[in-house]
């Protein structure tokens, strides 16, 4: 086919040349518009990504804060429960051992009365006085027992460091006597399940 069959732009009429030029410009504009849309989308996506990262960071911070608050709450609850248990125990002990201090004060009077009874009564007046002391002592011992204070068994018993205080040791007369109390120098007392005063004893070794 010869060149005459395909006319160049110069050979086209002026009107057709203008149409082709406009079409070319439109194509270029379309490409630019597509690129602009793409760029706009990318720019719009960037703030969204930043905002998402910020939200994630805030959620993580709030989650940690909530965990810290929950831990503090649990610790506070545990401290409150421990305080309540201590308070309950102290009250129970106070009720249970309310006579302990009074018992200790009375024991010194019991010791004095027992020493007074060891004095020999030579006349009727002394015997009457001794009888009165015996009655007083019996009343005190009975009152102590009624309030949970009782004498510790010591003479002839196996030495028990929770109940007895060894102040002296002597040679044992036989093997069975070893480690046993052979003399009580001062009586000991227990108050319910507590040792109010250990017995002062001599132990055979």
Curated annotation (Swiss-Prot):
Participates actively in the response to hyperosmotic and heat shock by preventing the aggregation of stress-denatured proteins, in association with DnaK and GrpE. It is the nucleotide exchange factor for DnaK and may function as a thermosensor. Unfolded proteins bind initially to DnaJ; upon interaction with the DnaJ-bound protein, DnaK hydrolyzes its bound ATP, resulting in the formation of a stable complex. GrpE releases ADP from DnaK; ATP binding to DnaK triggers the release of the substrate protein, thus completing the reaction cycle. The gene is grpE. Belongs to the GrpE family. Keywords: Chaperone, Cytoplasm, Stress response. The lineage of its organism: Bacteria, Bacillati, Bacillota, Bacilli, Lactobacillales. Coiled coil: none annotated. Pfam families: GrpE. GO terms for cellular component: cytoplasm. Residues 1-49 are annotated as: Disordered. HAMAP family: GrpE (MF_01151). It is found in: Cytoplasm. It comes from Lactobacillus delbrueckii subsp. bulgaricus (strain ATCC BAA-365 / Lb-18). One of its GO terms (biological process) is protein folding. It comes from the Bacteria. SUPFAM superfamilies: Coiled-coil domain of nucleotide exchange factor GrpE, Head domain of nucleotide exchange factor GrpE. The keyword Glycoprotein does not apply. One of its GO terms (molecular function) is protein homodimerization activity. This is Protein GrpE. Homodimer.
